[in-house]
Swiss-Prot record:
Cofactor note: Binds 1 Mg(2+) ion per subunit.
Stated name of the protein: 3-methyl-2-oxobutanoate hydroxymethyltransferase
Assembly with partners or alone: Homodecamer; pentamer of dimers.
Pathway: Cofactor biosynthesis; (R)-pantothenate biosynthesis; (R)-pantoate from 3-methyl-2-oxobutanoate: step 1/2
Catalysed reactions listed for this entry: 3-methyl-2-oxobutanoate + (6R)-5,10-methylene-5,6,7,8-tetrahydrofolate + H2O = 2-dehydropantoate + (6S)-5,6,7,8-tetrahydrofolate
Gene: panB
Keyword presence, Zinc: no
Keywords in alphabetical order: Cytoplasm, Magnesium, Metal-binding, Pantothenate biosynthesis, Transferase
Cofactor: Mg(2+)
Gene3D superfamilies for this protein: Phosphoenolpyruvate-binding domains (3.20.20.60)
Catalytic residues as annotated in Swiss-Prot or TrEMBL: 181 (proton acceptor)
Amino acid sequence: MKKISIHDLMKWKQDGRKFATVTAYDASFAQLFEQQDMPVLLVGDSLGMVLQGKSDTLPVTTEEIAYHTRCVRAGSPNSLLMADMPFMSYATPEQACQNAAKLMQAGANMVKIEGGEWIAETIKLLAERAVPVCAHLGLTPQSVNIFGGFRIQGRDETKANQMVKDALTLEKAGAQIILLECVPASLAERITKACTVPVIGIGAGNVTDGQILVMHDMFGISANYMPKFSKNFLAETGDMRTAVTKYIKDVELGVFPAAEHTFN
């Protein structure tokens, strides 16, 4: 696989070519994903739940994300690698710069930050300092205590309109990717059409430019339950490599996510 850059993703959006993304946490799986031509990987703070067994992502530290980023980069030298900025690691602009630097030095090509238009100045600051940013909207797991659980976001008109505004504000501030989690497909379509940067969805229908799944969900090995928006590709194929290829192709063809994986 050739080295993937944000410019490739921008070109794919312009060409209407959909792309797949998955979380990764170690060199072995990162290598497997790269061998199957997975273009984008995310070292997610989801590791707190799927690796550490925590009930949410809040305990994850920047040092832990940096460690797993180094592991993933070792296994996948050519993917576009995003790394999550954990809870409160970007509470101030100064903290954001210091912690983003650690993740970029660990091998990330981009950091992912949760938050609406209030985070625009931080994104602008990072972009000006050569740190590409993916802005995460919708269900932002670090806000689980505000939301009262993992709930669908943007179902009423006021919140939907605010999310569109957030996406455009963050793109203007310098975000190079927008990630939408657990939002109605109609809202995801509005945002995907409104933004010039690539939009990645998880639980956001099949109209976004890209899709992302947690690795453990894609292989059906999550400890607790299978989210509505996920699919066990390993059960369908019986082989991990074939499962990865099937996921990539289904995303590219717009077959996944299907109606049963989508919120209205």
